[in-house]
Amino acid sequence: MKIYIITIFPDYFECFKNYGVVNKAIKSGLVEINTINLRDFTSDKHKTVDDVVYGGGPGMLLKPEPIFKAFDYIKNISKNPYTIITEPWGKTFNQEMARKLAEKEELVIICGRYEGVDERVKTLVDEEISIGDYILSGGEPATLVIMDSVIRLLPGVLSDDESKEVDSFSDGLLGYPNYTRPAEFRGMKVPEVLLSGNHKLIEKWRRFQKLKRTYKNRPDLLEKAKLSVEDKQLLKYIIEGKEFEDLIKEGKIA
């Protein structure tokens, strides 16, 4: 995948490219990240990228000319990139959107700044994306979130395919709790079921915890999640306030 980022702060992304999964993906040739400095496409000596808002109003807007020129440059060196822009009023980014973007061969991400961009820029855009209902100084942080989520879904990026399949949201539910050594720390013990060696029971415990965590923190996700008959029964127990250990003692889970 090739990603082109139109921004006035190209250096913002250097650290992101140099560490972790993203760096491994770049070194493996699985992704190429190109930062396009918007100021390189201005026509005045001050490299002006913004201007006042017609009709009055606070703040400044990114001008259309540099963005269109930068986009034309990208189109000349690419095939048919899918173009998104980070906007607070865009569609809220989620795992399903990340999956769809991961299927694209080329992405262009336009980072907004100040009060946004001239509305005519939207004629270049396939999709407007927001990462949440809050205000950021610009589109760069949102772009990092989107890229990180998308890149890790590219084939071959993660060394263990299972690690991405069981992550939060992969099945519409939040992830289950995880523990490592020691088995007891400051009086807090790892759940006995995880030490039992009973893999079937461990899978049931994990499913129970996923449902419980989702019910507690993101109940809205349950409306869209594909729940089995067993899931619905577990959810009923969770709503009743029962713990997994209670269900084992009562003989409802074995």
UniProtKB/Swiss-Prot annotation:
One of its GO terms (cellular component) is cytosol. It is found in: Cytoplasm. CDD domains: TrmD-like. Pfam families: tRNA_m1G_MT. S-adenosyl-L-methionine binds at G112, I131, G132, D133, Y134, I135, L136. One of its GO terms (biological process) is tRNA N1-guanine methylation. Its EC number is 2.1.1.228. It catalyses: guanosine(37) in tRNA + S-adenosyl-L-methionine = N(1)-methylguanosine(37) in tRNA + S-adenosyl-L-homocysteine + H(+). Keywords: Cytoplasm, Methyltransferase, S-adenosyl-L-methionine, Transferase, tRNA processing. It is an enzyme of class 2 (transferase). Signal peptide: none annotated. InterPro entries: Alpha/beta_knot_MTases (IPR029028), tRNA_m1G_MeTrfase_C_sf (IPR023148), tRNA_m1G_MeTrfase_TrmD (IPR002649), tRNA_m1G_MTases_N (IPR029026), tRNA_MeTrfase_TRMD/TRM10 (IPR016009). Homodimer. NCBIfam families: PRK00026.1, trmD. This is tRNA (guanine-N(1)-)-methyltransferase. The gene is trmD.
